[in-house]
Amino acid sequence: DAVEFPEDGYHGDDIRELAQLFYNKEGDKYLDCDEKTRHDALAQFGLSHNIPKMKADLERYGIHYDEWFFESSLHESGYVADTVAALTAQGYTYEKDGALWLKTAEILAKNLRAAGKSDADIEKLALKDDVLRRANGFYTYFAADIAYHRNKFAVRGFDKVINIWGADHHGHVARLKGAMDALGLD
């Protein structure tokens, strides 16, 4: 509880449990390490703990994947950075406070107007922009998710995608669709 969650980070209760398990195993070993080393160790621990649970949950619903696609491959290949660069080239990003932001409010407002919503109705939604790259240089989960979906459509050639969303992703869908629109992908 002494560590604050990043504003744009995952805030589910299970993250506290995972952090405690990591601390029980590793202790203070990573306290004095650089942020990347600490991040990589936590990510690897989280994957080894959570992927088997996710597979078991999906199995209960009869869902089986032939291949698991890891977010880390998008970062390692530079595809997240490439996707953010594509959004920037289209004029959909700006820098503020050392971070790179997606013009989410502008994109969603444009889509809502095209769907027949009035400016007054759109104003009531209090749409906000999203951080793609934090001031510390790390890309956000949202940036990686945009890259992942771009990869599905633009690289792997999917024409239909079925997403299984967690209950905490209800606001994510329209924002992700907006990012796909900004990239010229449906």
Predicted regions and their residues:
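NTP-dependent nucleotidyl-transfer catalytic core
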Residues: 1-186
